[in-house]
Every structure is written in C-alpha cells, then in structure tokens.
C-alpha cells in the first residue's frame, strides 16, 4: 500500500436463495490505486456475504492504524457497527441466538487494528463502485469451484 493512511473500501454481498450459493465483491482504493476482491460460496446467506466482504477487505490489508471508510449497502452490517448492536451482542455473548457470531468475532478482531467508519449507500442505485461490487459478488456466486462457508454449513446455521 502507499504511504497514505487513508483507505476507501466498497463492499457488497449476494446470495442466490437465502440460504443458497453466494458471493462477495470488494473494491479497495488508496493513493490513486485500486484492487478488486471476490469469492463465491456454495451455501450461505446474503447477510453472511455482506459481512464476509468487509472481513475479506480488512484481511487483505498489510498495515494497521489505517483510517478506513467502508461503503456498504447492508443496513445489517452498517447498523450493527454504527449503532452499537455488535458491542451489545459481544457483551451478552450473542444471547438470544444472534446469527453470524463467527463472522462478527472475526470482524471485531480485525477492526481493532484500524480506524473504521461505515457509510450506508443505497444498493442498485447510482453508486458505480457499489454497482461494480454487486457484479463481482453475483459473478462469484454464479461461479464454479465455490468454497464452503464453514461457519454456516458446519454449524448448521440457518
């Protein structure tokens, strides 16, 4: 990455059925450069893919202490972080059967190393980066050699 500590991330997740095959798409932008990421899974949910997009973006970083703005069309992800839902879920041990604990804990670990701010964007609207992430996510969901979403399939989460 460049010497700039500013990073912009666009994310999207998709599933063909809920549950069904799914995928995520990510665009990272820094210092006039960009990188795209995507992956597909054979059985998952849209919320898991929305969150997995954020995790994949953060896992791709090789520096800590970055100022990151993440643009997402997922109110589930944006509100969980911005409105304190995640903090409450962690404090209560995800009581009441809150879903996606495995992914939320991965996100939480990664976010501790960065300065992350979320911005909600309307999906399938006039944001070209969100639209590109949607193409990446749906193409990945429709692809071959889909990965196993271990936290979903192996834990019987629905």
Kindly give the residue locations of the regions a language model identified.
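RNase H-like nuclease fold core
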Residues: 2-52, 58-66, 135, 139, ...
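RNase H catalytic domain
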Residues: 11-21, 55-132, 136, 141, ...
């Amino acid at each position: 990455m460049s010497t700039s500590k500013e990073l912009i991330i666009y994310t999207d997740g998709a599933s063909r059925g809920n549950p069904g095959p799914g995928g995520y798409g990510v665009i990272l932008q820094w210092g006039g450069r960009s990188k795209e990421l995507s992956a597909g899974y054979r059985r998952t949910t849209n919320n898991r893919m929305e969150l997995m997009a954020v995790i994949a973006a953060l896992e791709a970083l090789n520096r800590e202490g970055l100022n990151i703005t993440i643009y997402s069309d997922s109110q589930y992800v944006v509100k969980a972080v911005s409105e304190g839902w995640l903090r409450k879920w962690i404090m209560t041990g995800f009581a009441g059967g809150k879903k996606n604990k495995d992914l939320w804990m991965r996100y939480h670990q990664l976010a501790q190393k960065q300065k992350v701010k979320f911005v909600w964007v309307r999906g399938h609207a006039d944001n070209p980066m969100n639209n590109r992430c949607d193409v990446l996510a749906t193409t990945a969901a429709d692809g071959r050699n889909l990965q196993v979403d271990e936290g979903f399939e192996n834990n019987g989460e629905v």
